[in-house]
């Protein structure tokens, strides 16, 4: 994140999706405010935070939408996805059901996203927990099949949290069609080795 007061290069809309209880709000709050609440309440509808970060020397403003995972809020789905440039899909490595429902979330992204080349990041959360039931290999295989970035993280210990957002934003900036409508002459340099190829976060 950046405290630079200069005008941002662009403003990006980032969604955080996944089943209820997987730690979506905890990931967002750890990234934005560097706090962790083990008793974090379930999101009602949508939570919304604005922050900024520096990418390749440019300040990028982020509008982060933390969406509710409960079925009763799904009627609001189309408005959530409209105009988003990036989506973070979270599952809980201690919950097999949250992993098995990833197909549903990927279908929802494909159905409602208005940007065909939206950048997707799969996050395996709660890797600090001892009762893990979803392996790293399973997560990587799913991410590869759906052509998404992949990282393991813990909102509690902070592991992987900063990298999740950095890698996602770098990929978006490297895809000017997603955000560069008003700046036709501006292009960042070539992707770095840590950001190219594969589905793994290189942080």
From Swiss-Prot:
SUPFAM superfamilies: P-loop containing nucleoside triphosphate hydrolases (SSF52540)
Traits of the deletion mutant: RNAi-mediated knockdown results in disrupted clearance of intracellular pathogen N.parisii from intestinal cells.
UniProt motif Effector region: location: 40-48
Catalysed reactions, as listed in the record: GTP + H2O = GDP + phosphate + H(+)
Keyword terms, alphabetized: GTP-binding, Hydrolase, Lipoprotein, Methylation, Nucleotide-binding, Prenylation, Protein transport, Transport
Catalytic activity, EC: 3.6.5.2
InterPro entries noted in UniProt: P-loop_NTPase, Rab, Sigma_54_int_dom_ATP-bd_1, Small_GTP-bd, Small_GTPase
CDD domains referenced in this protein's UniProt entry, alphabetically: Rab18
PTM annotation (Cysteine methyl ester): residues: 203
One Pfam family recorded for the sequence: Ras
Keyword Hydrolase: yes
The organism's place on the tree of life at top rank: Eukaryota
SMART domains: ARF (SM00177), RAB (SM00175), RAN (SM00176), RAS (SM00173), RHO (SM00174)
GO annotation, cellular component aspect: endomembrane system; Golgi apparatus
Lipidation (S-geranylgeranyl cysteine): 201, 203
Enzyme's top EC category: hydrolase
Main function: The small GTPases Rab are key regulators of intracellular membrane trafficking, from the formation of transport vesicles to their fusion with membranes. Rabs cycle between an inactive GDP-bound form and an active GTP-bound form that is able to recruit to membranes different sets of downstream effectors directly responsible for vesicle formation, movement, tethering and fusion. Plays a role in apical endocytosis/recycling. May be implicated in transport between the plasma membrane and early endosomes. Plays a role in the shedding of pathogen spores from intestinal cells.
Similarity-based family: Belongs to the small GTPase superfamily. Rab family.
The name this protein goes by in its record: Ras-related protein Rab-18
Taxonomic placement: Eukaryota, Metazoa, Ecdysozoa, Nematoda, Chromadorea
